[in-house]
Every structure is written in structure tokens, then in C-alpha cells.
A protein has these predicted regions:
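Membrane-proximal intracellular helices of multi-pass ion channels
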Residues: 1-320
Length: 320
């Protein structure tokens, strides 16, 4: 045991972050493979549970089995926890646990936190981590409230609230997991809500808020609406995000979804533009889109979101 602890102390910050995520993924995969997590209370093949856990922690949204029908409530809660850990970061969770038990954050731990969020300085790291938790909780709570307004009438009170929470967290963390499977189509995502403004705007808002990044929102909160005072990174992220949302959306509007009414067509074009950059939801059959639109979506997927955000990709700042 002492040798193992000594080995851990020798790891650098990037190795600690990598090992932490691998540990979370493997732990989640083992739990998901157990009968207590499946709807029919049978063992899930480990490769399927490992794929699901990896996809959740890495906020990818790809699934090997139906999230709606294969997993029971415990399995869905495990997936939700993995998404949250992947979205706000492994080191954020560890830091908050240290704060909760009164443990002092060491210099090495501060360096790990700094690297996990791509921060340029170590000053105020603990307060920044607390800010991330508070910000995430408030945004996800608001998103869950609005989504529940639609889900409760459709699924009942308890299930509607759970669906609201699950999809709010999944959208904010840019994960793309959903619980809306149908018996005739196991992976419909949000296609049944293509014309629903409440669901579309809420999901899009959560994706954008999560994808812009915690540093950008901290800059906005500190300097309010004085755009000229924002740091260069925040300006680049905000302006480029607007470009990457509305220009592809306009292209999708005129090239795809021709049979839809104007309202649905507008929502659908905007939604596909927003969600493509790592979120993974969809409100339309993407296989029916034109080749040019699919090529644009591939580029958007590659770009992703902002540094220090819940989104993946090569990052907006790299693209800009």
C-alpha cells in the first residue's frame, strides 16, 4: 500500500488527471455491468457497459444499448453521475470533496486543477472551483425546471422531473444522452420535439452556456455588459460562437428540411447547428440532410466548444 501511495505521489499533473478519468470510467463500467443496473436485472456485457461509461465521462453521447430501455433507474442515475463528472471535471469533484472534509489543497493539487481547466494562473483556484459548482447547479436547475414543464404533462410528475433533470445535465455537459427511446425506434433523440419551442430553446441554451466555458462566463459576470473590457479569449469565443451558430443554421435552413413549416424549419436548423458542436442531440433525421450540410456538421463537430468548458473538440480558440 505504501509503495502504491509513493507511486501516486510521483505522478505529474497530466498523469493524475488521466488516471483519475480512467478510474472513474472503469468504476462506472463495473457498476453498470451488474444486474442491479439493467432493466431486466441481468448482467450487461462489460464491453457495452465500458462503452457507455466512457461515452458518458468523455461527454460523447454515443451508446451501444438504448439508454431509455436497457437501464433501470439506478443505471440511469449512474450514467447521470458520470456525465456530470465528465462535464465539470474530475478534479472539480475531488476539490469539492477536499473542501467538504476540511482538507487543505496542496500546491501540487492546485497545479493539477490549473491544468485541468487550462488556467494561466494559480491564484483563486479553489474559489473558481466553487464558482463552477454553483454556476453548474443553478444553470442545470433552471434548465430542469423549464424541461419539466413539458415532460411532467407527458410522463407524469416524478418521471417528468427526473427527465427534466437528466436532459438538463446532459445538455449543459454537452453529452447528448437522452431517455426518449420508443419501441419502434430505440434512438430517436429529440425528434418528437422538433416543433416545440420550449424544449428546443432550453436544450440549445444549455448547450451554448456549457460550451462557452466557465472562464468566459466569469468574465461576463465580472465585467457585465462592457464587451470592450472582456479579455481577448472571451471576445474570440463569443464572436466565433455566434458565427458558428447562425451561419451554418442559415445554410441548413435553405438547403434542408424543405417540407417543414417555417417555425419548425427555423428551430430545426438552429438546433442542428448548436448541437453538432459536441452535444450529440438531434431533432431531425441527419441521414436525410444533404451531403454539403453533413460536411459542415463534421467541421462543427471537429471545432467543438471553448477551452475550460463542458464541450469537447479542438476548441473555438484554436479554430479562430
Amino acid at each position: 500500500m505504501s509503495k502504491f501511495l509513493h507511486l501516486l505521489r510521483q505522478l505529474d499533473s497530466s498523469q493524475i488527471i488521466t488516471l483519475g478519468f480512467l478510474t472513474v470510467i472503469l468504476f462506472g463500467a463495473v457498476i453498470l455491468s451488474l444486474p442491479i443496473c439493467s432493466a431486466d436485472f441481468t448482467f450487461t456485457p462489460f464491453v457495452d457497459s465500458l462503452f457507455t461509461a466512457t461515452s458518458a465521462v468523455c461527454i460523447t453521447g454515443l451508446t451501444a444499448v438504448s439508454t431509455a430501455y436497457h437501464w433501470n433507474i439506478l443505471g440511469k442515475l449512474i450514467i447521470l453521475m458520470l456525465i456530470q463528472i465528465g462535464g465539470i471535471g474530475f478534479m472539480s469533484i475531488v476539490t469539492m470533496l477536499f473542501i467538504a472534509v476540511g482538507k487543505k489543497i496542496t500546491l501540487k493539487e492546485r497545479i493539477v486543477i490549473q491544468e485541468s481547466f487550462n488556467l494561466s494562473q494559480r491564484h483563486g483556484l479553489v474559489s473558481f472551483t466553487i464558482y463552477i459548482f454553483k454556476f453548474s447547479f443553478v444553470v442545470e436547475l433552471i434548465g430542469a425546471f423549464f424541461l419539466s414543464l413539458r415532460f411532467i404533462p407527458q410522463y407524469g410528475f416524478v418521471r417528468g422531473i427526473f427527465y427534466g433533470i437528466f436532459h438538463s445535465v446532459s445538455a449543459f455537459c454537452n453529452a447528448g444522452f437522452d431517455l426518449l427511446g420508443k419501441t419502434d425506434h430505440l434512438y430517436p433523440s429529440l425528434t418528437s420535439y422538433v416543433g416545440n419551442p420550449l424544449v428546443n430553446l432550453t436544450i440549445m441554451g444549455l448547450i451554448v452556456i456549457g460550451g462557452i466555458g466557465f472562464l468566459t462566463w466569469d468574465d461576463i459576470y465580472t465585467k457585465k455588459y462592457h464587451f470592450r473590457q472582456y479579455c481577448m479569449q472571451s471576445k474570440v469565443i463569443l464572436l466565433t460562437s455566434l458565427f458558428l451558430i447562425f451561419v451554418p443554421a442559415a445554410f441548413f435552413f435553405f438547403r434542408d428540411f424543405a417540407g417543414m413549416p417555417v417555425k419548425e424549419r427555423t428551430l430545426c436548423a438552429l438546433f442542428q447547428s448548436v448541437t453538432t458542436r459536441t452535444a450529440g442531440f438531434n431533432t431531425a433525421d441527419l441521414s436525410g440532410m444533404t451531403g454539403a450540410s453533413q460536411a459542415i456538421m463534421i467541421v462543427l463537430m471537429m471545432i467543438g466548444g471553448a477551452p475550460g468548458s463542458t464541450a469537447g473538440g479542438m476548441k473555438i480558440t484554436t479554430f479562430a
